[in-house]
Amino acid sequence: MTRTVLVLNGPNLNLLGTREPQTYGRRTLGEIADECAAFAETRGFAVDFRQTNQEGQLLDWIHQARGRVAGIVINPAAWTHTSVALRDALAAVELPVVEVHLSNVHQREAFRHHSYVSPVALGVICGFGSLGYRLALEHFAERFEAAA
């Protein structure tokens, strides 16, 4: 089995560190990517960390993941609440998925309370800032160790 986890990030996450830091924190997406890579390396696997503001690009990356990665960590951002296509793509590739959100979406506007992704994810981590990514990767580290 491949020991790579695809970490996908949706729209506006390229603005982390400057966009609403009181909600999303001060870490940049580049810093989060570096932290994810360093954590994965200590646990013996790799991450492929990506971000896009184009929904079609995100869907293409998900489709290409089948047979190439062991699982997906995804912060779908606003597409969480709007994209049936994203939900369908994640279901179609039949990979384990962990959904991550920096903020606690359930403490925010009502429209953020619904996720199209959650029904096809193994779990959801929200409200812990950038730590959520590491927690999601910890899940995959434990899967790899159990399979060894």
Swiss-Prot record:
Gene Ontology BP term (one): amino acid biosynthetic process
Gene3D superfamilies attached to this UniProt entry: Dehydroquinase, class II
Pathway named in the protein's UniProt entry: Metabolic intermediate biosynthesis; chorismate biosynthesis; chorismate from D-erythrose 4-phosphate and phosphoenolpyruvate: step 3/7
InterPro entries: DHquinase_II, DHquinase_II_CS, DHquinase_II_sf
Keyword Amino-acid biosynthesis tagged: yes
Gene Ontology MF terms: 3-dehydroquinate dehydratase activity
Entry EC number(s): 4.2.1.10
Site positions (Transition state stabilizer): R19
Keywords: Amino-acid biosynthesis, Aromatic amino acid biosynthesis, Lyase
List of catalytic residues: Y24, H101
Binding-site list for substrate: N75, H81, D88, L102, S103, R112
Annotated NCBIfam families: aroQ, PRK05395.1-1, PRK05395.1-2, PRK05395.1-3, PRK05395.1-4
Protein name: 3-dehydroquinate dehydratase 2
Organism: Pseudomonas aeruginosa (strain ATCC 15692 / DSM 22644 / CIP 104116 / JCM 14847 / LMG 12228 / 1C / PRS 101 / PAO1)
